[in-house]
Amino acid sequence: MTAPMSPLLKTLIHRLIASLVVLAGVSMLMFLIARVIPGDPARIALGPNATEAQVQALRHERHLDEPIPVQYWEYIRELAHGNLGNSLYSNRPVRVDIAQYLPATLELVFTAGLMMTLIGIPVGVLSARYRGRWGDHIGRIASIMGVSTPAFVWGVILQLVFAYLWRLFPIEGRLTATLPAPPSMTGFVLIDAALAGDGRALVDALHHLVLPALALAMAGIGQTARLTRASMVETYRKPFIEMANAYGFPESRIANRYAFRPALVPVLTILGLDLAALLGNAFLVESVFGWPGLSRYGVEVILHKDLDAIVGTVLIIATAFLVANIAVDLLVALVNPRIRFAGGRS
């Protein structure tokens, strides 16, 4: 007799199956949208000087002269073998382009996520702990400014203040042009520099990363701070907090041990989803800072109506959302033992 499947494993299987269905729907929708956008991708790729015969040959090679259902079937057949198609814009396999540009965006997104966590949560905790005082008012105003101002505007402001006026940070790029890049082993400049023992490149890469990551993180910092404050203020009204106050527990212990952990569940949920959303929101920040990442690449392929590259880029971003969703659910269940997975006790 086989042992019953654990609730955790059952939940993971259910989520993975649902994720595959979502990815299939996203691929179908984006495939259709990409093909109804006005413009001939073959003509755009070859340029205005190409002959009609050359354009027709490219259409036939890429199945662009076939009905859309046939085109989608051919795409799914290639996708099943790990082939995302070939880019008309770069004339390379889409997976090669994604492998080149994705590490730069992930480096930016992970750094922004770290800033959201390390800045947003403490600001929210302090605002809740000192609610109604001047520190709380400053934190709330700063949070509203962070949420209400677009990321690209923050990028321009940070460039003007810290790059043009004070000259504390570089304006654009991942590394100084005159500095030799470390050997590319992972595509992540920080990791490559650390593995190569190149301290100068590591410091320079961090120097270039601060402003774009901060611009990308500002809205998330504000949202995280506001949600942390609201969750903790609600927790402060619970009877067990009133009992802790009655017993004379120190304010710091009440805030950090008793009020913070219950308030962490909604914060973790939003943080995980915001981290995945940064992949899609990074395109304007990458354009402002000249950051050679996947989001900037996605804008270029949309402008060139590069069909396979459009679908491939969106699939990567959709996969990031789904992975983040599953990871957040697991993390929340670990933080809050009262939450049970599907199939467990409620």
Indicate residue ranges for each PLM-predicted region.
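Helix-terminus/capping and membrane-interface signal
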Residues: L20-M30, A104, L108, F321
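Residue-level signal for discrete positions within transmembrane alpha-helices
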Residues: S19, Y101, T105, I141-S148, ...
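Hydrophobic alpha-helical transmembrane segments of membrane transport/permease proteins
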Residues: V22-W73, F162-A201
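An internal, D/E-rich "acidic patch" concept
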Residues: M1-L8, D65-I121
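Hydrophobic alpha-helical segments of integral membrane proteins
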Residues: L8, L16, I68-L84, V94, ...
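Short loop segments and helix-boundary regions at transmembrane helix junctions
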Residues: L126-T149, W154, Y164-L165, L227
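Alpha-helical transmembrane segments of integral membrane proteins
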Residues: S6-T11, L102-G135, A181-S346
